[in-house]
Amino acid sequence: MKLGIVGLPNVGKSTLFNAITRAGAEAANYPFCTIEPNVGVVSVPDKRLDKLAEIYNPEKYTPAVVEFVDIAGLVAGASKGEGLGNKFLSNIRECDAIVHVVRCFDDPDVIHVNGHADPAGDIATIDVELILSDLEIMEKRIDRTKKMMKGGDKAFAKELAVYEKIYDCLAEGKSARTLSFEEDELEYTKDLQLISMKPVLYCANIAEEDIKKEDIPYVNIVKEIADKEGSGVVVISAKIEEELGELSPEDREMFLEDLGIESAGLDKMINASYTLLGLISFLTAGPKEVRAWTIKKGTKAPQAAGKIHSDFERGFIRAEVVAYDDLIANGTYNAAKEKGLVRSEGKEYVMKDGDVVVFRFNV
């Protein structure tokens, strides 16, 4: 899973990225301090994997991972090359979803490009640039398709209708993700890589002192916008997350306890991203390795097996599955098997989150 972190300059985007990866992107108080897109890979928090590691004491522990791409600060006019322009829009196109960091705090010492915090205005500014960039793509697609139809090939009529539907939506200033498509229309959208069609998780970046507040006016604005478009929202303080990133796991727990917070904002962000993209994890466990594997909800057993190795999918015979809770309750895989809790599933089995699996195959 690859997530692109976007936001206007000085909203706390690089501070957040530093917290995620400790990769050292220079979080200076100056627009465009992020000149190249930084990429960081972080583990997906999963206590189930920790528990399996206690049981199996494996040689290798491999959590699922999320790749974050820190996109340099976008500004009004980016789609026309202002600020750092189109190069960075192209980096977002390669991502599965967008994490849009929105400034939800006032601080005279941290310059805002518009002079003051304005969540709705900031979101609109970014949206306009992404929509304009997508409009340019759709114009080219429509022109190309019309030329093909002039050559007498009427097979492109349906394709053109889908492209024009998207174009009209964008021309009204709406993101492509607000559209709904019939099953046969989706086929024509797959290779477009439209940014405004990607799922969005808004990251409301609040002041440290507001971390325990339930009602924050700036955050309420972000939530209202997200609700209207079916996007997700997480509330974090990037500064607190940065501080947490410098601590040992033990000290992190103590720090969170002192703050009165159950879990780190970054953990919430990763989990919310999974939900937004409809992802789940299945687990494999043994003395050599315990590992989490990321798949889409609705994935069948052979395709899940293919995540491990293409031979597993090609020669799939069956999946031997035990629910994580059943395995833990019985202490070991063999004990669960003796109680009849390990099921033999075939090619049509739809994987569930937390399935602990052994795949049987023959090639």
Q: What are these language model-derived features?
A:
Residues 32, 46-49, 62-68, 82-96, ...:
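Amphipathic alpha-helical transducer elements in NTP-driven molecular machines
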Residues 2-6, 17, 144-350, 357, ...:
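C-terminal-of-GTPase-core extension/linker across diverse P-loop GTPases
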Residues 23-31, 38-40, 48-51, 80, ...:
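Glycine-rich, flexible loop/turn motifs
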Residues 1-111, 139-140, 144-145:
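Conserved G1/Walker A P-loop phosphate-binding module
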Residues 40-45, 72-82, 93-156, 169-182, ...:
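Conserved Switch II/interswitch segment of TRAFAC-class P-loop GTPases
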Residues 92, 351-352:
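Short, well-ordered loop/turn sites that connect or cap secondary structure elements
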Residues 6, 32, 37-40, 47-49, ...:
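Short capping/connector residues at structural and topological boundaries
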